[in-house]
């Protein structure tokens, strides 16, 4: 990452086929926050929603969770995420960092459950909190690099 990328907003995504969790954070501070969930089943609808978020937040870069199997091998969603990352980078002309997202949804679900958030409300928030965990992992990795 260049010196120019030490400040600015970051938007992170936990990509799903129906819902995509979104988190935000500031590079200088390194703390991630859940932001919203995009309800969209098509890539075009998802990109339109991201277009609005990007216009509002003016991100310096994007972080995208890279789903893999438990052993780290790739699956169909890995390919979907890689294609989505290329599309993001092309459309917004911002770098996209891919971050291992193994267990983020399960961890997010556990954290929400521990706070007494269950059912449909939990399902909606799980993706945004998973995006937060992905982004926080990105920030934490920058500190140890």
Curated annotation (Swiss-Prot):
One of its GO terms (cellular component) is cytosol. The keyword Nuclease applies. SMART domains: YqgFc (SM00732). Keywords: Cytoplasm, Hydrolase, Nuclease, Ribosome biogenesis. GO terms for biological process: rRNA 5'-end processing. GO terms for molecular function: nuclease activity. InterPro entries: RNaseH-like_sf, YqgF, YqgF/RNaseH-like_dom, YqgF/RNaseH-like_dom_sf. Its EC number is 3.1.-.-. It comes from the Bacteria. Could be a nuclease involved in processing of the 5'-end of pre-16S rRNA. NCBIfam families: RNAse_H_YqgF (TIGR00250). Belongs to the YqgF nuclease family. This is Putative pre-16S rRNA nuclease. It comes from Thiobacillus denitrificans (strain ATCC 25259 / T1).
């Amino acid at each position: 990452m260049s010196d120019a990328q030490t400040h600015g907003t970051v938007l992170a995504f936990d990509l799903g086929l129906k819902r995509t969790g979104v988190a935000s954070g500031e590079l200088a501070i390194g703390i991630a926050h859940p932001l919203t969930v995009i309800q969209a089943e098509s890539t075009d609808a998802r990109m339109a929603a991201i277009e609005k978020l990007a216009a509002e937040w003016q991100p310096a870069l994007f972080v995208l969770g890279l789903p893999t199997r438990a052993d780290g091998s790739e699956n169909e969603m890995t390919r979907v995420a890689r294609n989505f990352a290329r599309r993001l980078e092309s459309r917004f002309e911002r770098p996209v960092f891919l971050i291992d997202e193994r267990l983020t949804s399960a961890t997010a679900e556990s954290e929400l459950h521990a706070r007494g958030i269950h059912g449909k409300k939990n399902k909606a928030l799980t993706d945004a909190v998973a995006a937060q965990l992905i982004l926080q992992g990105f920030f934490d990795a920058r500190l140890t690099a």
